[in-house]
Amino acid sequence: MSQLYASLFYQRDVTEIFSDRALVSYMVEAEVALAQAQAQVGVIPQSAATVIERAAKTAIDKIDFDALATATGLAGNIAIPFVKQLTAIVKDADEDAARYVHWGATSQDILDTACILQCRDALAIVQNQVQQCYETALSQAQTYRHQVMMGRTWLQQALPITLGHKLARWASAFKRDLDRINAIKARVLVAQLGGAVGSLASLQDQGSIVVEAYAKQLKLGQTACTWHGERDRIVEIASVLGIITGNVGKMARDWSLMMQTEIAEVFEPTAKGRGGSSTMPHKRNPVAAASVLAAANRVPALMSSIYQSMVQEHERSLGAWHAEWLSLPEIFQLTAGALERTLDVLKGMEVNAENMHQNIECTHGLIMAEAVMMALAPHMGRLNAHHVVEAACKTAVAEQKHLKDIISQVDEVKQYFNPSQLDEIFKPESYLGNIQDQIDAVLQEAKGEAK
């Protein structure tokens, strides 16, 4: 992506993890781990592994990235020209040790392992971001647990809720995101080492012990078998990121709608140069929401490519594996960027309680129609109560009067409720159901005390 847009859509640390320089550094790390693992079990001399490790410490500064980029276009992947350059760097230190660089491995072993190392570090950042969003949403849910506002369905006013309930639901989504991240780690953060067709025939009868030592060197999990052609691990990582981005996309949709001029209930935090218009000085645009929604729009398209990459030929694929190199880094960067902007809004959101109250009142009591119906239902049955309230609603709309004024004159209603009882029925805060219980449950879950 253009650097001009990076600050709008990405997060700096995750973008750095997926930079060219970082990728090559992870590949160097994989090659060093391979050499040390093989030396540990006697496949190559320890002296060679020591030289390779020593040379690797300065290798990143000696790699010719321009030449690497040109050669990658000819070779079909970065590993082939990378290994040539790394071998030359080691050769400058010790010609004999250079013979053991990339011993027994194939290009995909190094690239897949480097990819997993990238995922491990990027996932740690994403997890921390989600944790911060979770904690902030919990805090705000507690702060606004009694702030009554309109609940909306099909973009229409429905029944009263509280802002704290909305935020508790968001917090609960973040909790599930954290659970998903934790659930996949052992399954997906694993090393790849299989040689040309996954058999490690190049290492003869020492393949299994080398794989074990290799994974331990990298602090990655060891798999029962190679996974060159079975890409479900990559897909699972991307899928969790896709869910996270979708979750924050839903939140951004909500707060952007609440920022509409006619609603004006919640606003993104202000900052110099933020949210303005080039032609309309009065505008306060939901810039963070635009960024998050763009990510939530883009990630599903990238996920389509990731899912299609599962259908691979035989032991190692042509093209499908390569498509991951384009999609996965972008998914990570967009997810991290969306989380960063969501956290900013959660921390600095501005709430207009007066507008929330005015929006509740703008229907002149119609939003309390269900409350009236349910209060009448025990006396006359739900269906009859529905008919009575429905007729009153139509009259209130036609005469442009408050529903309470109309319903209070209905004989069937006067029979059961006096004016003070009707006043209580029409209070939005009296018709919030079990919202407070739900908020408590979300807060307790965060303490490990889920009911």
UniProtKB/Swiss-Prot annotation:
Molecular function terms, GO-annotated: 3-carboxy-cis,cis-muconate cycloisomerase activity; lyase activity
Keywords: Aromatic hydrocarbons catabolism, Isomerase
Family annotation (SMART domains): ADSL_C
Keyword Lipid metabolism assigned: no
Catalytic activity reported: 2-(carboxymethyl)-5-oxo-2,5-dihydro-2-furoate = 3-carboxy-cis,cis-muconate + H(+)
Gene Ontology BP terms: 3,4-dihydroxybenzoate catabolic process; beta-ketoadipate pathway
Assigned EC number: 5.5.1.2
Disulphides: none
Top EC class for this record: isomerase
Domain of life: Bacteria
Pathway: Aromatic compound metabolism; beta-ketoadipate pathway; 5-oxo-4,5-dihydro-2-furylacetate from 3-carboxy-cis,cis-muconate: step 1/2
Alphabetical list of SUPFAM superfamilies matching this protein: L-aspartase-like (SSF48557)
InterPro entries noted in UniProt: AdenyloSucc_lyase_C, Fumarase/histidase_N, Fumarate_lyase_CS, Fumarate_lyase_fam, Fumarate_lyase_N, L-Aspartase-like, Protocat_PcaB-like
Subunit structure: Homotetramer.
Function: Catalyzes an anti cycloisomerization.
Stated name of the protein: 3-carboxy-cis,cis-muconate cycloisomerase
Origin species: Acinetobacter baylyi (strain ATCC 33305 / BD413 / ADP1)
Lineage of producing organism: Bacteria, Pseudomonadati, Pseudomonadota, Gammaproteobacteria, Moraxellales
